[in-house]
Amino acid sequence: MASGFFVPGLESKYNTKEIRESMLKSDKAKIDSSFKKLESLEQEKSAWQLINRKISTLNSLAKELTSLNSPFNLMSGNSSNSEVLTLSTRYGSKNETHKLIVDQIASADVFLSSNFDPKKVTIPEGDYIFLVGKKEINVKSNGNIDLLVKDINNKGKGFLSAKIVKSDKNGNSRFVLQSLKEGKENKLVIKGEGLSFAKQIGILSELKTNFNPNLSDIVVNQSSSNNKLAFENNGLVLNPLSEVSIEIPEDIEITSRSKIKFEVKYFDTGLEEPDSKIIFNPGGATFKDAKVESEDSVVDLGSDLKTPLEKKYIQMNMVKICSKEGSLELPLINISNNFEEVEVDVGALSNLEEINIENKANNKVIVISNVEIFDPKNRDGHLPINAKSFAENAKIKFDGVDVERDSNVINDLVPNVTLSLKKPSSDMVEAKIEPDYEGIKRVLLDFIGAYNEVLAEINIVSSNEDQPNNQKSNIVEELTYLSDSQKEEAYKNLGILRSEFLLKNLKSKLESIIFKPYVTSDPNFSIINQMGVFTNSISSSGGLSRYLRLDEKKFDESIRNNIDNVRELFLYDLNGDRVYDNGIAKMLGDCLSPLVASGGVIYNKIKNYDLKIFNQKNKVEDYKKKYEDRERKVEGELNTLDFTVKRMKDQENTLKAFDFNQRNK
């Protein structure tokens, strides 16, 4: 602030600069003092904000440990071969291990056409019907193959997709139909004009793969005195030592996958089946010489009311397949005394001509029904020619039990665990559901680190250290993890809140929570140092720093081998009401939440600083204004003095000149 006042030759003589500074000294001191107070308030607020952030972080970690999503409540799913099987866990999963073999993964129907030139093929017009399981997709074609693909994709969203893929440089393409649903119940069936189109471009074969032989005709044509057959209740009865022959029609295509399935049962000769009917005679009635006789009453009890038979089985080689090259007797079949469905592979011989079913027992009667020869890969009797994959269920052995599912994502085998099948393998895969040891360790390390940072900030702002000649602080220097900027801020905050009893009481409370014993299932495991967390009570400065330290080996072993007690040490439900009542994390959260919550103690302190800083800024501005006013007044007075001195000097010179002239007269 320049005075603008200078008297040549008199500045030093009258000390006008010193006079000016002396006159403004008290006003300048008020500005400096109020500004320092403002800086101090802003630094104190910054210190409280830093403490608030550190405490909030520690409180959040305490809340995380006691929440439903606590790593103590979550399990980790680990597979011994993630290329075959992976697993993910949800809340509520248990610590368990299972052994699985993935025999087959679930797949969907993907059918390709033969090569064709889209420009030369004629697309049938009309209704194209596609079934994916029970979902029907109806598309009307106008003869344009590109529009057909577009309509299939629009109407088949989530169920069916179609595309045309260029297959060579000669302009040929292949039509691809892909079911978007896995599982054998979601077979892709093509009907309507779509069936004609599929046959035309080589998606489906012209030949059929399935047929149902007429059992009554077989009985009529093949029964004899030496081959006693009968047709009763839609079933073909093979008496002892009888057989039937099922000829394969010429229009039926038999493949290596072809099977015969039928329902079969047996009963011993001379024994009738238990009757499901009750027959009784209600008698007659006579009235005035008129007599009425009643007919027998028949009550059909139905199958549910039949006298149940004890289920028994016999074994028999009863299926033989024949071709021009010879015949082959198929393996034993288990036959029950109640109807059960059996399937037998019949595709072992090429050019199959007939299938024989024989009753080789001389004291058993065999009954068969619902006979069908089929290819399991057929679609409504037609065989896909260029199938990339077929709709199949996933098949696994789960702890030795055969299991089928229609998806590779299985949620219902292990509670709250999802198994994801990747590929089949004959190797056994071990699926472990176990505590998330790494997740627990990570959060506990974060918790310990956050606790130490809270303690460090309290130690810094509460410090009573003297720093003569800018001597370094032991409290700050022992915090080796601080960056240069953080260390600079720490020195600014050193001792700034040393009069705050709240922080001293908080430190004492935190240490009490951390180091006191807690109730766990193991009376020999109740304090934190038993899991490898301890404190070196004396800091490098000779004070009580009480920072937490780790015995890493003991810490890791406790988490890995004693996880239940570690959990109880941090969060414990005393009465089984699923609400945590005790433990380090629980008690720490209860202590810290009221401090940092909106309206809490520290929150309000920071808010109060906003008002103090606002008022102090006004005070600084007020002192500056008063200083400027005072400065202008002083400058005015000194300028007046300057003018007076100049006039006096001029008068002095005038008088000297007058005196000189008088003497020279």
UniProtKB/Swiss-Prot annotation:
Any one GO BP annotation for this protein: cell adhesion
Effect in UniProt of substituting residue 227 to D: In strain: 212
Reported impact of residue 424 to A: In strain: 212
Location(s) in or outside the cell: Periplasmic flagellum; Periplasm
Pfam family, one: FliD_N
Reported impact of residue 289 to A: In strain: 212
Keywords carried by this UniProt record: Bacterial flagellum, Coiled coil, Periplasm
Coiled-coil features, chain-numbered ranges: 602-658
Cellular component, GO annotation: bacterial-type flagellum filament cap; bacterial-type flagellum hook; periplasmic flagellum
Complex and partners: Homopentamer.
Annotated family: Belongs to the FliD family.
Described purpose of this protein according to its UniProt entry: Required for the morphogenesis and for the elongation of the flagellar filament by facilitating polymerization of the flagellin monomers at the tip of growing filament. Forms a capping structure, which prevents flagellin subunits (transported through the central channel of the flagellum) from leaking out without polymerization at the distal end.
Protein name: Flagellar hook-associated protein 2
